Each structure stands twice: as structure tokens, then as C-alpha cells.
Amino acid sequence: MEEAEASLNEAADRLSIPRSAWSGEDFNVLAISGGAAGGAYGAGVLVGLTRAGRRPNFAIVTGVSTGALIAPFAFLGHQWDDRLQDAYIGGHAAGALGLGGLSPGLEPGLFRTVALQRLIHPFVDEALVSAVAAEHRLGRRLLVATTDLDSEKPCVWDMGEIALRGGVKATQLFRDVLVASASLPGLFPPHRFTVEAEGVAYEEAHVDGGVTAPLFIMPEALLHWRKLGRRMQRGRVYVLVNTVLEAAPRTTALNLPAVLVRSFDTMLRVSYRQAL
């Protein structure tokens, strides 16, 4: 019990923002959901808030699936709005997810991982990762969730800690986590990460974070911690849901991509409503 309490204290310390950095401001948390192409809505909301002069400063930003792709730009602020807009309305998806991105034969996904990488890599460069590291040093936190298929559990990545490593390897891992969080099962193969435990190296298969966590505010253990309110005062939580929560009846085409997307979309609608 004492070890668990110490672990929660440490996690809260990592997520708590130093008073000097946020004195006089509310402790705002932004949770961005999945939603595939609906991410264009979330991007538009953020840009619209900027133009209206109503965009809050966020101490913590979390993202899942397409929300994970938006999260770094939401985290870094309005200066990155142009890149965020280009990522979602610049027509890049049509090129990356065309016939050239299809997987040959019996692959674990309809599209190859490289198709998703082509969408993400141009917008997530060393400059962006360095900017995330700078904000992390100020005490702000950027968190992204994937789903570990092997353990059947969500995995929360502290992207600022990754960014702090600096260099090419940090940028590559940063990109890999975003690719994994957006790897919709059936459409894209799982992304494999090499990890080490007790001196033994092995691989974990990670897919879309929305499989286990349609959205999240912070790691679940912290949400249920009785001392959380005292550690994080003056908090507001903003939730950006990148889909319509009401059912949208229509005829589903009887082909693999249409059935996969429709099934996953239905599952997510229900899980979003339950999460909210």
C-alpha cells in the first residue's frame, strides 16, 4: 500500500504544474478524443477558438487516435495553427491512403504502416519535438494513449519525457507513438515497440488508443486517488470529441473497409457516450 501511495505521489508530482509557471491562471486540462477523419472538426475548433480570442492555456493535453495527432499542436498553442490546419485540410490523406498505400496479400492491416507515416512525419519534425520539450521543462504535460494488444491494456506515454531526450531517436519515437495511437485495427497493422524487462528484450504490439480509452484526462489510477483534488486545485477539464455522439443510420457497403470502419465507428460512439 505504501509503495502504491508513493507511486501516485510521484505521478501527481510529474503532472502538477509549478506555481511559478501558472500563478494566477486556472489549471486547464484538454482531453482530445479519437474520431478518424472527424479530427478535422477538432482542429477547426482549436483554430476557431484562437481566432475568437477564447482559446485557454492548457496545463495538460491528452490525446487518443486522431486526437493524439492533434494533441501536440493543441499543446504548443496558436503559433502552430497553420501546421495543424495543413495536416487536416491540406489534402494529404487522399495521397497517403490511396491505392499505393494498400497492403499486399495477407497483411495484418488493409493499409501499410508507411501510409500513416506519410501522413504524420512531415508535420512532426525535430522543431516540433524540441518545442514540446521546452514546454515540458516549464511543467506542462502532453500525454498520448495507445492500446497494448498483448496486455489488453491502455498505455499512456509522456510525450514531453520522450522529447527531452532530443535528437533523431527522440523524434522517431515521438512519431512512432503517434502512429501507434492512430493505427486503427484492421486498417493499419499494429506498431511494434522493442522493450526490455529484467534484462530480456521483447516486442509489444500497440494499436489505436481508442480501443481501450476513447478519451482520457490522466492515468486512471490518479483519477481515483483521494488526494488528487488537493494536489491539483483550480482545475477545469475541457473535452473535445471528434465525432457525433448520436447514431447516424445509413446503409453500409458490403466490402471490407466499409464494414471495418462502420463497426469501429459504432463501437466508438457507444464508448464515447459511456466515457462522458
Predicted regions located by residue number:
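Patatin-like phospholipase
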Residues: M1-I60, F75-L276
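Active-site loop->helix "elbow" adjoining a glycine-rich segment at hydrolase catalytic centers
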Residues: A37, S65-T66
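Hydrolases whose catalytic domains are alpha/beta-hydrolase-1, hotdog thioesterase
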Residues: I70-F73
